[in-house]
Every structure is written in C-alpha cells, then in structure tokens.
C-alpha cells in the first residue's frame, strides 16, 4: 500500500510540472521535392523552377507583331515570288514565321546558294528598307527588261517573274556587255540578290542572249565570283528544262558592288537595307497569330514567366527560360512536412528526435510550446525564422539569377546535301540539352538537401540553446521537450525563449524538487525490492507445499512407491 501511494505521488508531481517544447511548423501542404537521398519528400513550402505552360498562340513580341509568311517561305519573300505579293511592303517585325506548308519559294527551278546562311543572317534582322537598287526604267537601256517572264512563275493567269529581280535578255539581236555598280550609302548592310540562268540548249542560249560564250562577274570588297552558264539537257521541273541559280551577298556601308555580264544575268531590281536587332528569329509553326503580347515565343505558343527553366520547346525567341528535358524542378524553401526520425541528411545536423511538426504554430518556422499554471500556447522564434527566410530567399534568388540566362534559341537550317552536318548538329544540341538538364536537376537535388538539413540544424540549435540555459533546472523528457524542476510562469518561459533565463534564481528550488522526486523514486525502488523478495519467498513456499501434497496423494493410491529408510 505504501509503495502504491509513493508511485501515485511521483506520478502526480510529474503531471503538474511545467514544460517547454521546441518544435517546428507544419501545414496541410502536399508539395513534394526530391533530394540527393530521397524522392517525393513532402515539405511545407516550395517554389517551382520549371515552366510547362503556354497559351497556344503566336503573339507580338514586346509590342511588335511577327511577320507571318503564310504560304511563302524566305526565298519566295526575298526574291519576290508573285504569290508573295502581300509581303512586299513588310518592313519590320519581331520575328518571322514560316508554316509547314510554306511552299512558295523559288518558282523557276534551281538552287538557292547558301540559303541556310541567309536564313541565319535574317534571324538577327528586325527590319529592313526595300529600295530600288537599279531602277528598271533607266538602268538597262541596251537590254530588254520586259520579256524575261516564265510560265513557272504565273500571276493572274499570265506568265510573270520575281518582283525583286529582272531577267535581262537581248534587245533585237544584240546583248552588249553590261557593267553596273552600286555604292552603299545607306549606313547599313545591304542585302543584294541576283540569279544566273543555265539554258538547256545552245539554241536557247542564242535566242535569249545572242552570245554563245557568255559570262557573269559579280564583285565587291568581300565578294568576287565569275560565273559561266552550264548548258545541258535536264529533266523538266515546273515545265522548265533550264535552271536558275540564286545568289546573295551583303554589301557593307560605303562599299561598292559591280555587275558585269555578256549574258545569262538576272539582275537585282530591289535590295534591302537591313537593321539588326537582338531577340529576332525565324520559327516554323502552324500555330495561329493572335492579338496578344509576350516576352517569349515558342512554336507551340507564348510563355509569360519569370522561371529559369521551361520544357515546352527548345526553339525560343525573346527573353526565354532555358529549355531542359525535365518534368519536375521544384526547390524546397520550407521544412519537411512529415519528418521522419530515421531521416539523415547529407550536410547538416538532424532534428530527428522531434517526431512531428505543429500545425498550431502559424507565425514562424521554428518555435516553442509551453505549459504551466497560467495556461499553454505556441510561440514562434522570430529571429531564427527570419534568418532562415532571408537565407533561403537569397539562395533561391541567386539560383534563379544564375540559371536565368534568357536567350533566343533559333533552329538551324541545313540543305539536303548537308545531312551529315545536320545529324551531327542534332547530336551536339541533344548533348547540350542533356548536360543542361543534368545540371539543373543536380542543382535542385543538392539545394533541396541543403535546405532541409539547414532547417533541421536550426531546430537542433534552438534545442541546444534552451538546454544550455536550463542545465539541471529541468530534465529532457524526449521529443524536444523539457520538464522544469521549478515553477516557471509566463515571464520565466519568455526569458528562456529570449535567452535571458536566470539559472541561479531557480537553482535552489530546482535542487529541492529534484531531491524530493529522486527520494520518492528511491523509496519506491526499495519497496519494490522488498515486495519482490516477499513474492519470491511466498511463491517458493506455495510450490513446496503443492509438491508435497501431490506426492502424498500419489503414495496413498499406489501410483508412487514411497520408502522411508532409517
């Protein structure tokens, strides 16, 4: 009975002790992040770094509309294919759009030399001035300028030709040697295009140009080339057995370009003074154009985001996030929402001794829960919380700033003879994408591991801060909690939280209560020992008596022979 009273006294004393616990915030977030060691870790707060949404529209880029080529391509637009007449007045754009069925290009069959390089040059041009470099009415008085038309380039049901070129043929029975120069006074680069005609027979050569042994020379300070017509029988394309090759060059400001020929020259009529601009480009897309505005355009649609990565399309125009192949890039900013005692981090201390977060603490990441005679409640440790918020915010901003190198990534063009180069380029591009994706994912994994360990370390530090103040005035009872050996009112609790706890002031009371509790425990232990001895002796006596009774009964009924020797 005495032992029971002592145990109840000890239990009653412990139940009424004031307590202070250290813990951390928890909420109903379902955000998950990956770390180096774990996948799908639920956290209280996180930020997404990967944009995966677009509006499905082609928009203005920073307020400037794109140039949609419709059924025409770059070649048809610049040469002046009659089917592209609506594009001839275009002078400025944010980017150029071709579609998958942009078939109106070179109407007279032939090769467009260095066409892919020309597209690359245009990808950095935001506007140009189309001007008459050699006026048709006055530049070629000794040559015919109106007979150079073909059924391969029809317009309104009649034979026609490129609007930006003039196909010169003989006048009468004469094709005098021509020599014409243009001096670039535009203070901009000037794009000049021309053509060389290759007839199928010598008869066609004479009927068009009179001169059997004709030549063409085009020269500037950076371009010099002499051309000879290649007369040969070829299969008909678009009804033409002849071929026409197309050439271009850029004439620098102040430079001169000269055309000299005795036949077969398709001279430029219009040229283009180009203005370069960053952020332009050429995309191939069947997405419709809408009246909207964006800072980043992809062939699939516009992206309006400040995130550093996107997985929508590798081809982008404007200020765009970097393309990666990832499907998830989420960076932890808060704590583990369901902590595990077994969790072990890679970089810092672990607060694994605290099994669960507190949903009741909403004004901070780390803090306290106290209970005394005046009541109980939660209180955040604002200093450690604010330091953590500042540190993590700076880290996230730094990561975004470092990785958010926004840029235009236009596609590269290769002709049908450059398939090996195209395949090699694709492999190189894929390699870069793999590296960027790996770097981005590894960065997020490492930073998430650091962040979660950083939070655990902060909780551990807060616990150590309290333990170092209380010393033996309280005891650790597990799960981040302390039980005081003295009365600790709200003022006392606040002093522990703010680091001003007066240990000597409470040490005498704590010592007495600690000795009293230890004495109760010791007396209880002695009583238990006495009871244990008594129980053992009593059990032995009962066992001996039982064995004797059984033996007597067995001897009396003959089941057991009993002999008594003296």
From Swiss-Prot:
It is found in: Virion membrane; Host apical cell membrane. SUPFAM superfamilies: Influenza hemagglutinin (stalk), Viral protein domain. One of its GO terms (biological process) is clathrin-dependent endocytosis of virus by host cell. Residues 551-566 are cytoplasmic. GO terms for cellular component: host cell plasma membrane; membrane; viral envelope; virion membrane. Keywords: Clathrin- and caveolin-independent endocytosis of virus by host, Clathrin-mediated endocytosis of virus by host, Disulfide bond, Fusion of virus membrane with host endosomal membrane, Fusion of virus membrane with host membrane, Glycoprotein, Hemagglutinin, Host cell membrane, Host membrane, Host-virus interaction, Lipoprotein, Membrane, Palmitate, Signal, Transmembrane, Transmembrane helix, Viral attachment to host cell, Viral envelope protein, Viral penetration into host cytoplasm, Virion, Virus endocytosis by host, Virus entry into host cell. The chain crosses the membrane at residues 530-550. A lipid is attached at residues 555, 562, 565 (S-palmitoyl cysteine). The keyword Disulfide bond applies. It comes from the Viruses. Palmitoylated. Residues 1-17 form the signal peptide. Disulfide bonds join 21-481, 59-292, 72-84, 107-153, 296-320, 488-492. Belongs to the influenza viruses hemagglutinin family. This is Hemagglutinin.
